[in-house]
């Protein structure tokens, strides 16, 4: 706590500034994480996607691109995407040089993302439509030069000038014309040279104003073409290509000249080794270390055929996230046309309130849409306490179900921990369940509320670490917890709760909190006693 004033003063003011009272909280919600394969796109980062067109531009085609589009169709406001690619993957690239007499490297073009697709990118550099101006002021060094300018490919212009201490020198563009009172401007190499005997001293200032050619850079992969016109320098080139879907540019340290006109293809791009489960695991943990999503979906269920080897990877990931007080629900679809018996056998190996296995998670679109993605996005999009099994929350953008189950099969699968979809004025979950066997943790809607409370508790408790364990502070801690739960009661997400905050009697640095919460119920069964006959008069 800050202390203001001098405690040693005989007469004076000392102020101890303390934080008191309950803590308000702000918790991010509505974030869906997607992990999958695609033909292109970044592999070393979890990319925030704000609109479907961004996903299409970055990932081009493949499961991840389709998943991003489907997730946005569910009304999910924010999506983070991670592309899975094998180890040893590499971006296609090409080093470029300037147009000087002895060319120097000025930077490297890189494909916008890793993979062999980058080898199809062709780059054309040519003169821009407009001229640019280079203005420089620097001190002489006592020699005639040459003095290197920041630009090359200089244009002869009546507006060009070179001055020494404000006195202009006559510009010549041929070294053989250099003479008294003149300065030679080398248009190709971007240098100036003074006449012998008229060398600027270290006490004199050289002022230069010259016109030079800009560059227009065209990128194409024979499907998409991007053109960037009238680029003035390397920094401008780097900035203009920063959001390109095809290629980026990184200047070489110390380089100043624009690259020479040329046409070339990027090369040496690689997809790396075959994708294995470790690659999916790394992608998931990259997502978890970047953002705390509400839900996560993976676009595939296995790497090795008939193994379902990605489900345990997702199972472990969501458990790890919960252990960090950032719980999220993970969604994965089972194999297309899987039998009821095999689905029940699959679910028997899992008991996790944060894992959802979709029994009939594919539609009839071409390509088929992954309903695990749609379900994850819908769970992230709906309000806390609202079930995605509501008819009004039916999945959007899907075309029928590839497989439908009858009532007995849906009941058996639901009891066995497999979530199933039904077609009834829209395609929606029958109940929307996880693989958990305890009824308290069976439904996704209840787990989203539980996850929100866990995240809120972590946020609140962090505000009280290392504070004095006084009755005042404990009261504020209790009020903070009550504040978040009172709001959920008002919103109809929690029916009632009980909270106690007590100092531990043995450990003076510990506080014990007892929290009991009853989630709001969601009507699934209705029993009617229907009496028929003569009713007694009131």
Region annotations inferred by a language model:
Residues 1-137, 150-198, 202-468, 475-478, ...:
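A glycine- and small-residue-enriched flexible loop/hinge signal that marks low-structured segments
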